[in-house]
């Protein structure tokens, strides 16, 4: 079990839509929500036509990295229990963390 922190990229199991299995995928840790639950955001390597997607590349990391250029999708928030966090991949630079948080706030305030 991993102890996450704000700004971390972690691997967690994302279930298939039919719930028969799950695949490990990266997620960005946004905030602690209490009782070992964390608010996270989806990360993908697919450049969706998502106007809010934020590109993350190797130079955006303080430590660690992803295998390829990826995209944080700030409109895809979810809560996950610490018990499902499998591995910490790295930490994003403070400036990138601030950019992602600002985007989440803008999405919430705009009502999108």
Language-model-derived ranges and their functions:
Residues 63-112:
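C-terminal terminal-subdomain/extension
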Residues 18-20, 68:
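Coiled-coil-like amphipathic alpha-helices with heptad-repeat character
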Residues 20-23, 29-62:
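Compact nucleic-acid interaction/catalytic patches
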